[in-house]
Amino acid sequence: MKTIFSGIQPSGVITIGNYIGALRQFVELQHEYNCYFCIVDQHAITVWQDPHELRQNIRRLAAKYLAVGIDPTQATLFIQSEVPAHAQAAWMLQCIVYIGELERMTQFKEKSAGKEAVSAGLLTYPPLMAADILLYNTDIVPVGEDQKQHIELTRDLAERFNKRYGELFTIPEARIPKVGARIMSLVDPTKKMSKSDPNPKAYITLLDDAKTIEKKIKSAVTDSEGTIRYDKEAKPGISNLLNIYSTLSGQSIEELERQYEGKGYGVFKADLAQVVIETLRPIQERYHHWMESEELDRVLDEGAEKANRVASEMVRKMEQAMGLGRRR
């Protein structure tokens, strides 16, 4: 059985973009693959985090993973900082990565642009991400387009390590879903929907109530033409809404174009709002159940225990290959 690894930062907000692009497919993948789903809290502290808020967000994210349908009997759900091997492996990989490779990362350029000072952690984020993936002999990493460059660097580091120290790592592949992988902002459909957008109208969260969802979709940017057809270049706003509708309803974009032929944006948006509300309602109910349940800690304890067994063994092999410590 092939292995999948995926990590999400505990930022406190999960958008429907995250749900469609990642979480939703995780639920299907867990039955076909050996899956590790990681709450990457060490990645989160590359920028300042309020400690109390971070700890709350870790718990909330775990509850959201379970609420969308991750089954702890089928997949391993754990917190990155509870598995020390991640930081240990990241240091070893930092020692074989080049500064130039890290500085070329698009995300580093974007996040450091215009800032007087940036943390070293922001620059060395990719080796930690590579460690996350390589520790579990990962075959497949489901990611959005924006993470492709990091996976390419992970592959380079795995190949470099294998060449220098002997075959140890599986070379992972990125899996980018074709439909709905890149859900765009509701206020600027040329940009990806992001939880860090300063305008809350730009995204819908997993926990938004019905009224908020209706308002956000009603105010979503479209165009003045008024016809419901998919054209990413000329009609990015309505194309983005069609993408959301198609992915959540299971109807093809062609079916939706026929269904709404001759109908206005108002009718389409009202129907889409109901599709989103009905999709999120059971998730929200399960989320509140998990947040109030002591079972959540048991799931995370078991996940950390399982991940530690696998990851610590890989770190031992890495250290042995690099000549660290004593041979036992």
Swiss-Prot record:
Chain residues that bind ATP: 9-11, 17-18, 144-146, 183, 192-196
Motif ('KMSKS' region): 192-196
Compartments, record wording: Cytoplasm
EC number: 6.1.1.2
GO annotation, biological process: tryptophanyl-tRNA aminoacylation
Keyword Protein biosynthesis applies: yes
Protein name: Tryptophan--tRNA ligase
Organism: Geobacillus stearothermophilus
Gene name tied to this protein: trpS
